[in-house]
Amino acid sequence: MSGKDRLAIFPSRGAQMLMKGRLAGAQKGHGLLKKKADALQVRFRLILSKIIETKTLMGEVMKEAAFSLAEAKFTTGDFNQVVLQNVTKAQIKIRSKKDNVAGVTLPIFESYQDGSDTYELAGLARGGQQLAKLKKNFQSAVKLLVELASLQTSFVTLDEVIKITNRRVNAIEHVIIPRLERTLAYIISELDELEREEFYRLKKIQDKKKIIKDKAEAKKAALRAAGQDLRDSANLLDEGDEDLLF
């Protein structure tokens, strides 16, 4: 395992616990981001279907509005100056609010009517019915345009956030988690190797002490066979063992 495949860390019990915690955190974060991406995808597909539906309806509404404009001009004549003289402010205005989807803020635009709604225009003696129809059709067109602008803004915002979220999910799934798993496996293998080395070292020390003890017992037996008083001899078994290092 090359150093690029894992994190550079000294193998120890503390490092093992640290890697386990980081791995658990990465897996939890991956799960949360995956759920967020799924929720955004659901809203994204819903907005896409609404955009298609609204654009289809927009074609019909704009066609009707254009026909109403031509009809009103044919009936009334040029009424632009009369409208400009009698209209002091716009009745249809736009307000915005915010919607939250899985932590993503989406701007929502909606149109509303400010003030009284009247179809009577001073100075127009004929064509009132056509003008009322014209105004109503263009109000519907403005409402749809505002709705479409809101949907497309949310569409672009969600598209960018989904791309970023998917990149993060892929990075955690294919880079971060595998690297943490390889690092944890490396630490475990190194600790196992250290345990085997320690076991082997302790076994060699025990074998060495057994050999020394057997030699001391043999020497003691030889002295006893020669009739030598062992009480006057130094007790070899009481001598301190020298340090055995490997």
Curated annotation (Swiss-Prot):
A Pfam family of this chain: ATP-synt_D
Family matches, as InterPro entries: V_ATPase_D
Gene3D superfamilies for the chain: 1.10.287.3240
Keywords of this entry: Hydrogen ion transport, Ion transport, Transport
Coiled-coil regions listed: none
Subunit and interaction comment: V-ATPase is a heteromultimeric enzyme made up of two complexes: the ATP-hydrolytic V1 complex and the proton translocation V0 complex. The V1 complex consists of three catalytic AB heterodimers that form a heterohexamer, three peripheral stalks each consisting of EG heterodimers, one central rotor including subunits D and F, and the regulatory subunits C and H. The proton translocation complex V0 consists of the proton transport subunit a, a ring of proteolipid subunits c9c'', rotary subunit d, subunits e and f, and the accessory subunits VhaAC45 and ATP6AP2.
Family affiliation: Belongs to the V-ATPase D subunit family.
Protein name listed in UniProt: V-type proton ATPase subunit D
